[in-house]
């Protein structure tokens, strides 16, 4: 059984036991988190939401809160001695999908 959930403005296909990285969630490590925005549930019987499937939830356990690889942003204006170097690390949450309830 698999499901498509929406989190952080993205749609992610998940299965039970799968580990996924999502945009940072305000949850402590080791806690459980429930996704209510389930757009699609597939398996033996298919359920398509309009826009979400009624009563469907996906439960996950938080493994880790972290930050991604550093991205360097460099902007400049030619011949003006004007430049700026900036770095960014996107925060993420690593989850393990425990249960899909449809």
Curated annotation (Swiss-Prot):
GO terms for cellular component: cytoplasm; ribonucleoprotein complex; ribosome. GO terms for biological process: translation. InterPro entries: bL21-like, bL21-like_sf, Ribosomal_bL21. SUPFAM superfamilies: L21p-like (SSF141091). GO terms for molecular function: rRNA binding; structural constituent of ribosome. Keywords: Ribonucleoprotein, Ribosomal protein, RNA-binding, rRNA-binding. It holds the Pfam family Ribosomal_L21p. Part of the 50S ribosomal subunit. Contacts protein L20. PANTHER family: 50S RIBOSOMAL PROTEIN L21 (PTHR21349), LARGE RIBOSOMAL SUBUNIT PROTEIN BL21M (PTHR21349:SF0). This protein binds to 23S rRNA in the presence of protein L20. Belongs to the bacterial ribosomal protein bL21 family. This is Large ribosomal subunit protein bL21.
């Amino acid at each position: 059984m698999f499901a498509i959930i929406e989190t952080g403005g993205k749609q992610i296909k998940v299965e039970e036991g799968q580990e996924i990285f999502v945009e940072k969630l305000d949850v402590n490590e080791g806690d459980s988190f429930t996704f209510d925005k389930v757009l699609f549930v597939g398996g033996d019987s298919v359920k398509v939401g309009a826009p979400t499937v009624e009563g469907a939830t996906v439960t996950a356990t938080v493994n880790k809160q972290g930050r991604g690889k550093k991205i360097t942003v460099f902007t400049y204006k030619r011949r003006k001695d004007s430049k700026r170097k900036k770095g960014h690390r996107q925060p993420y949450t690593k989850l393990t999908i425990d249960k899909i309830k449809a």
